[in-house]
Amino acid sequence: MKTRALITLILLSLLATATNAIAAEKREVLKTYSVKMVKAHLPSAPNNGTDDYRCFLLDPKVTEDSIIRSIQFIPQRKDYVHHAIIFRVTDANISEAISRDKSGTGWPCFGGSGLGGMLSSFVTSPWISSWAPGRGIDLSPAGYGIPFKKGERFVLQVHYNLLAANGGKIETDQSRIVMKAVPSKGATVKQLHVELFPAPVELACPSGVTGPLCDRKQALIDLAGRTNNASALEAAGIAALCGQNPFKPIASTTSTCDKVMNSNFTVIAAAPHMHLLGRSMKIILNPGTSAEKLLLNVPNYNFDDQSAIVLKKPVPVTAGDTIRVQCTYDPTLRQKLPSLSKLAPRYVTWGEGSSDEMCLGVIAATKS
């Protein structure tokens, strides 16, 4: 779990597993807000592609400053909704969002919400939540929540993977969001924010596998045709964010990015997001030093279970610390997985489509 969504991103899930979190929610005076897409959307992929990314402006009609305790994306078409991301619309972007969704039918948004410029999601992180297979209600841990101001709105980005439609039948979708919140006034709940940690993806065709799209340049041209030009530039943008040379990419089955923090915060939970070639992910604080701590370790990544993991003990991070995200992949899965095996071999980069890849670590934290 839109920046770029999306990446796909995925996204942040704070799916509660502890009974004390559930009990705490029951004791709170919660107000429920439910909102669905203004109009039903019939997914379609551009230029003979297989993926449709669509953003919708939604107004939950929140009447007071609040703190979100739980939020749930409820897909109407579970078979081909690949993932969804819920963004907060910032004051700076509300006019643009209203203009883009005048008809209530949303707008194409490969790579984030499309608001605020390229890679804005990775820079400003206006995420609230995300959904992917295996996730249910996104419930913050006991004592924590996400601030949401009176009158604020969501942008809901939905990724439709049309390859997954049952029998190839595509129907209209009108998914919805259900949110539970407490008033900010008088609340003792600590406020969470989201930090995103992307890494470049550069996967060459496996040994012995050939085809026109095994050439990186041709693969990026194809990516632009299936999505848009901005999406094809994301690989270079993310490499630059990670301090790597975007003009000299190095193919590898391991993706890594180090990010130096410029503020203090405390990590409460972490979640992984990759696509179908992903094998493992780690998020490491201060790697290679005596202060090294493992924030997230997913040794056997499962696309159908991208739930966030609440840390046993919150971990403080200070300005100047380094956080590394590291992902590993198996490109041979393109020839083995039913959903990918019929597609042409290709050099795989960061991209929004189900047949592209991502390496995205997501952290939920409180500001110090």
What is the predicted function of each stretch?
Residues 1-8:
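Bacterial N-terminal signal peptides that target proteins for export
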Residues 8-17:
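Bacterial N-terminal signal peptides
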Residues 18-24:
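Boundary at the C-terminal end of the N-terminal hydrophobic targeting segment
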Residues 24-266, 271-368:
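Beta-strand-centric surfaces of beta-sandwich/beta-rich domains
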